[in-house]
Amino acid sequence: MIVIGTKCQLHQPVTQELTAAAVGSGALPVFGTPFMCALMENAAMTCLQSFLEEGLGSVGTRLEVSHDAPTPVGMEVWAEA
């Protein structure tokens, strides 16, 4: 059973490979929105994984996000689920 209030936080340093320029979602060397969404989904998956039986997983079905500020290479971002 999933425990209400369980939280999981993942941290990710921003590297050149994780920029909008690298993924093609923009031209600037800042943290790309597709990578932000992936980090958010990964935090949710990581949080749920300990409650699931072996061989089971979770899937994302909907995202509503707002990417409000650029994060340059060298800084760290985090997602909490």
Residue ranges: model-predicted function:
Residues 81:
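Conserved catalytic core of two-component histidine kinases
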Residues 44-78:
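Hydrophobic beta-strand-centered segment that forms part of the acyl-chain substrate-binding groove
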Residues 30-35, 72:
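Residues at secondary-structure transition points
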Residues 1-32:
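Catalytic strand-loop segment that frames the active site of acyl-thioester-processing enzymes
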